[in-house]
Amino acid sequence: QMCIRDRAPGLFEQCHHLGEIQQTLINLYDEPEHMKDLIRYLVDYELELAEQLCTHLKPDALFHHDDWGSQVSTFMSPDMFEEFFLDGYKQIYGYYKSHGVELIVHHSDSYAATLVPYMIDMGIDIWQGVMTSNNIPELIKKYGGKISFMGGIDSAKVDYEGWSRDVIAKEVHRACDENGKLYFIPCASIGLAMS
């Protein structure tokens, strides 16, 4: 038996849930110190929650949710992501790992290929929600063994009125044929049907 804890929203989504996504992105440019203060506060909150979860629930794995982009691009440059979010996630995921959590699964159903080095640095074991726009075979070739990729089936291809088992089987076979057997787990990206 394995205990898996899900946690949402993540740091970026918490920022734009407290405000609004467009204003949050503007604030990263116009109010960087205030945004860093907010993110530090959110990290402290996440660490307090992690302490309670690890003390009482003792999860084996964490499924953490924070969308970092659209289908075609991240919401911010890799440099900006590093400046604002990398250290916080290293603290959060580091805490979980040092307190018995064996597996960190991070959900971001988006394009985020440019952030994979940071995912590895912050301790993510599996990126769940990886969309086909990320060139998954290239990511596996470059980063396989350091991180695994779970996705490769864009939800819009299988989650719509009129879907069929044949359509799903075809997409699963396509994903497995394109991405191989190592460091890849076929899975729908999870987003809405239009994503």
PLM regions: where:
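Active-site loop segments of alpha/beta catalytic cores
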Residues: Q1-S195
